[in-house]
Every structure is written in structure tokens, then in C-alpha cells.
Regions:
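Acidic, gly/ser/pro-rich intrinsically disordered tails
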Residues: 1-4, 18-24, 40-47, 62, ...
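Structural detector for short beta-strands of small beta-barrel domains
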Residues: 8-16
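Conserved positions in beta-strands of structured domains
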Residues: 14, 20, 57, 81, ...
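Short aromatic-glycine-enriched beta-strand elements
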Residues: 21-34, 94
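Disulfide-stabilized netrin-like
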Residues: 45-59
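Beta-rich strand-turn-strand
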Residues: 57-93, 106-107
Length: 122
């Protein structure tokens, strides 16, 4: 059975990105994205907002931290991932997030932060 996991989102950061490093030294950057959806219902304009957490690794993470700020408009190309963990009390938790392969800066930036496997100039 063929499988396909691709997500493309455009939205605005709701806060500045957080950058941290794993014990192995891998950069990890997380930022929440507000994605708006506009539609009409019964001749009335409506809007929904979806808040999605995005996580980037390596070079994409470091460049995202350097260039992004709250309010930045970005286009994210990535995949949907489910993170699972257990609390100290033994409760199982999970959350969905988008793992970014690349982040395109729409306003105030130039270029793309490519995925780790790519070697494109910025």
C-alpha cells in the first residue's frame, strides 16, 4: 500500500521561535503557526484559524531562529508527525506537529531555508 505524508502551510508565527539543542548537538526550533481559512456560509464571510506547532531540525532550525519573529509570514513544507510520551505520573500523552523540511520567508526575508539533505545557498 502506498503512503504519502506531505504538508504545505502558509501562516503567521504567533510568538518568537524557540531554539534548543539536543544532547547530541542537533538544533531543534519550534514555533506556532496561525493558519487562516476564509469561506462563505449563508452569504456571510467567515474565517477560521488553525494553530499548528511546527518543528525544524539542524540548519533549518538555526536559520528559522535567526530570521523568524512573531508575526512573520512563512510557507512551511514538511510532514505531519505524532509525538508520544508518558508523564512522570504515568499518563500517556501525544500531540501532532508539522516537521519542516523547508521554511520559505514570505515577508521581510529572502530565499528558503532548505532541508538538511539539500545544499542550496541562502
Amino acid at each position: 500500500m502506498a503512503e504519502y505524508n506531505k504538508v504545505i502551510l502558509m501562516g503567521n508565527l504567533t510568538r518568537d521561535p524557540d531554539l534548543r539543542y539536543t544532547p547530541a548537538g542537533l538544533a531543534v526550533c519550534e514555533f506556532p503557526l496561525a493558519v487562516h481559512y476564509r469561506y462563505r456560509a449563508h452569504e456571510e464571510a467567515k474565517e477560521d484559524v488553525c494553530f499548528i506547532n511546527v518543528v525544524a531540525f539542524g540548519r533549518v532550525a538555526e536559520r528559522s531562529k535567526e530570521r523568524l519573529r512573531k508575526g512573520s509570514c512563512v510557507l512551511v513544507d514538511g510532514r505531519l508527525s505524532q509525538r508520544r510520551w508518558e508523564t512522570p505520573e504515568g499518563q500517556k500523552r501525544s500531540k501532532y506537529e508539522v516537521v519542516a523540511n523547508s521554511v520559505h520567508f514570505i515577508d521581510g526575508g529572502s530565499g528558503v531555508v532548505p532541508g538538511q539533505e539539500e545544499d542550496l545557498p541562502i
